[in-house]
Curated annotation (Swiss-Prot):
May regulate certain MYC target genes, MYC seems to be a direct upstream transcriptional activator. Does not seem to significantly affect growth cell capacity. Overexpression seems to mediate many of the known phenotypic features associated with MYC, including promotion of apoptosis, alteration of morphology, enhancement of anchorage-independent growth, tumorigenic conversion, promotion of genomic instability, and inhibition of hematopoietic differentiation. A motif (Bipartite nuclear localization signal) lies at residues 95-113. Pfam families: Myc_target_1. It is found in: Nucleus. Belongs to the MYCT1 family. GO terms for cellular component: intracellular membrane-bounded organelle; nuclear body; nucleoplasm. Down-regulated in gastric cancer tissues. The modification Phosphoserine is found at residues 135, 138, 141, 149. Keywords: Nucleus, Phosphoprotein. This is Myc target protein 1. It comes from Homo sapiens. The keyword Amino-acid biosynthesis does not apply.
């Protein structure tokens, strides 16, 4: 789109320049014709004054009007011939310039366009690099804050839980019956839910929450090893 606009502007500029050149040529041609006629007329008057054969009865010399008409026609003819010759020379020069102008104009327009697009690309590169630098700085600050928060959280003494350190795919299982000497006792499920929530909270820490709430939660110890053995008796 920009290239089309630039081409249209260049065409309009060159068309206006050609019209202005034509007007200047016409004005120059008219000036040359007028000067040639005026100079020839002055030469004729000087000739008449040099060969002055006036008589006392008439203020004008003999055959004055005939000589004036003749000089005017001759001066006009000479002026037209000179003007036509000069016009033909100017047309030939303008055609040669037009034949050689598009290459230089096209190359100059291409150079200016390439320099302009190169400048735009460089400005875009600087903008993108500035954005990337800002994003990198923001990411670095976020990671630094996260590391600092993790270090603060780890600085407090905390018990390491068995369920948080190992992977348990079957956590949400129904309570298991335990055989005792007199009756069957089911393991309470209240100990499982906080361990699940705490394990999830430890596996996915919320960086945007306050550190005091996360540190204050303490995980209960796992069930006794003997109860697990009794829950799965040997068959």
């Amino acid at each position: 789109m920009r290239t089309q606009v630039y081409e249209g502007l260049c065409k309009n500029y060159f068309s206006l320049a050609v019209l202005q050149r034509d007007r200047i040529k016409l004005l120059f041609f008219d000036i040359l014709v007028f000067l040639s006629v005026f100079l020839l007329f002055l030469l004729f008057l000087v000739d008449i004054m040099a060969n002055n054969t006036t008589s006392l009865g008439s203020p004008w010399p003999e055959n004055f009007w005939e000589d004036l008409i003749m000089s005017f026609t001759v001066s006009m003819a000479i002026g037209l011939v000179l003007g036509g010759f000069i016009w033909a020379v100017f047309i030939c020069l303008s055609r040669r310039r037009r034949a050689s102008a598009p290459i230089s104009q096209w190359s100059s327009s291409r150079r200016s366009r390439s320099s302009y697009t190169h400048g735009l690309n460089r400005t875009g590169f600087y903008r993108h690099s500035g954005c990337e630098r800002r994003s990198n700085l923001s990411l670095a600050s976020l990671t630094f804050q996260r590391q600092a928060s993790l270090e603060q959280a780890n600085s407090f003494p905390r018990k390491s839980s068995f369920r948080a350190s190992t992977f348990h795919p079957f956590l949400q299982c129904p309570p298991l019956p335990v055989e005792t000497e007199s009756q069957l006792v089911t393991l309470p499920s209240s100990n499982i839910s906080p361990t699940i929530s705490t394990s999830h909270s430890l596996s996915r820490p919320d960086y945007w929450s306050s550190n005091s709430l996360r540190v204050g939660l303490s995980t209960p110890p796992p069930p006794a090893y003997e109860s697990i053995i009794k829950a799965f008796p040997d068959s």
